Amino acid sequence: MTISGVLAGCPAPAKLNLFLHVVGRRDDGYHLLQTAFRLLDWGDRLDFRVRDDGLIRRTNQVAGVAEDDDLVVRAARRLQQATGTPLGADITLHKVLPMGGGVGGGSSDAATTLIALNHLWQTGLTRADLQQLGLALGADVPFFIYGRDAFAEGVGEAFQPLALPAAVYVVLSPEVSVPTAEIFSAKGLTRDTPPIRIADFAASPTRNDLQATACSRYPEVARAINWLEHYAPARMTGSGACVFAEVASEIEADEIVSLCPARWKAWKAKSLARHPLYGLLD
């Protein structure tokens, strides 16, 4: 909903990495990746109200995240500094996505903040401008601003559109938080997977190169994959901890979700062709 100075219920959708290959490492330590990003219809929501006094405030508490550390607040301040706008904002974050889950929660929240405030503040930045701002906040932020399924390379910021059929997924959180930096810095991590071409994506064998390391350090991730494998081929998304499986129907997804062990959480999610706020940057 939008009225003058307000955007309410702005979606911050989750993402899946349908595969994730580490194909090299730059001299500065950043890993070179190939991945297929997929948007989901499941995620957080944010409300924005413009302030005339220039203050950026998060109006609610988010467990375990101080206001100044929140990517939402940092994104708003970064846009404010980059554009010189005198305006501020009150931001309310309705958190659903698990933190440290590999579904892009914080990055998606930051991207939605950049898109929504660029619109409300009328700062006039382009999609490419916002992607550049977002990259400094997190490697996944540019994808959410890109706003559609993509084949990504580089450190995850170079995109090609990916045409994928609609799909239904079960996403399972084993209720552990996996620090991305820990997984990428692990000595045993595979860093030399041969690159594939986008044209070969559907026919090529793929995997998540981070999965073995995450499973060895966080056995609950391995247990979640093994459980979900009883119903459909499963793998980890991102650096974990969430795991997912594509299923044939919403009915099947609902049934699997209902059987999820009580110590974990599970959701049904459908694919999204485009980010719900995509049109704000057209």
UniProtKB/Swiss-Prot annotation:
Explain the purpose of this protein: Catalyzes the phosphorylation of the position 2 hydroxy group of 4-diphosphocytidyl-2C-methyl-D-erythritol.
Cross-referenced InterPro entries: GHMP_kinase_C_dom, GHMP_kinase_C_sf, GHMP_kinase_N_dom, IspE, Ribosomal_Su5_D2-typ_SF, Ribsml_uS5_D2-typ_fold_subgr
GO terms in the biological process aspect are: isopentenyl diphosphate biosynthetic process, methylerythritol 4-phosphate pathway; terpenoid biosynthetic process
What pathway, per the record?
Answer: Isoprenoid biosynthesis; isopentenyl diphosphate biosynthesis via DXP pathway; isopentenyl diphosphate from 1-deoxy-D-xylulose 5-phosphate: step 3/6
Name of the gene encoding the protein in the UniProt record: ispE
Keyword annotations from UniProtKB, A to Z: ATP-binding, Isoprene biosynthesis, Kinase, Nucleotide-binding, Transferase
Indicate what this protein is called per its UniProt record: 4-diphosphocytidyl-2-C-methyl-D-erythritol kinase
The organism named in the record is Azoarcus sp. (strain BH72)
- Pfam families for the chain: GHMP_kinases_C, GHMP_kinases_N
Catalytic reactions on record = 4-CDP-2-C-methyl-D-erythritol + ATP = 4-CDP-2-C-methyl-D-erythritol 2-phosphate + ADP + H(+)
Q: Enumerate the active-site residues.
A: K15, D140
Keyword Kinase present in the record's keywords: the answer is yes
The organism's superkingdom is given as Bacteria
UniProt similarity note: Belongs to the GHMP kinase family. IspE subfamily.
What are its E.C. numbers?
Answer: 2.7.1.148
Q: Which GO terms describe its molecular function?
A: 4-(cytidine 5'-diphospho)-2-C-methyl-D-erythritol kinase activity; ATP binding
Kindly give the NCBIfam families that the UniProt entry links to this protein.
Answer: ispE
Binding-site positions, ATP = P98, M99, G100, G101, G102, V103, G104, G105, G106, S107, S108
* Nucleotide-binding as UniProt keyword: yes
